[in-house]
Design a protein with these regions (language model features):
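Loop-rich non-cytosolic ectodomains and luminal regions
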Residues: 1-169
Length: 169
């Protein structure tokens, strides 16, 4: 990834072809359905065995959409970021702006990069502080900061299922 000047983001979320293909699996398409709309598919690609719409949130985008949140079970997602800040060694600390009733935990709470273009992953765990389902969609954000860059990832948590072809990233 090459970035410079005012478009320098600090961290980037790279999304690969397999991320998009997995997304199609998660929303219910099989290999034949994917081949009908995708120009090229890697020869070794197969839909994950446990594909279902619960995994739509795992596409490696900066934004996060959690559906079917009933307040009883936590929802876990993971993200991978690439350090493109140009400083090589740097540490990003996380801050979370969570809506009332939602607990958001980020693991780890710091990303320590030792070089440019290094990739690190983190996990976000969404749980309810009230153990009840949501009455409406709620919004918040996760922000990674190293003193030079702020990288914000907005999120939405919904009790809706998304089963009506309303898949949002």
């Amino acid at each position: 990834v090459t970035t410079s000047g005012p478009l320098q983001p600090g961290l980037v979320y790279e999304t690969r072809t397999t991320d998009y293909l997995n997304y199609l699996c998660y929303i219910g398409l099989d290999i034949d359905g994917i081949k009908a709309i995708a120009k090229t598919i890697p020869n070794d690609f197969a839909c994950p065995k446990d594909s279902n719409s619960d995994y739509v949130s795992n596409i490696n985008y900066p934004s996060i959409a959690i559906s079917k949140f009933d307040g009883k079970a936590s929802k876990n997602i993971s993200r991978t970021v690439t350090n493109v800040g140009g400083d090589g060694k740097t540490v990003y600390a996380v801050s979370v702006d969570a809506p009332s009733g939602i607990v958001v935990k980020v693991i780890p709470d710091q990303l320590t990069f030792t070089k440019n273009n290094e990739k690190l992953s983190y996990q976000v765990i969404f749980s309810s502080s009230t153990a009840t389902s949501l009455k409406e969609d709620v919004f918040g954000s996760i922000t990674w900061t190293n003193g030079k860059f702020k990288v914000r990832s907005p999120f939405v948590v919904s009790s809706k299922s998304g089963d009506n072809d309303e898949y949002v990233l």
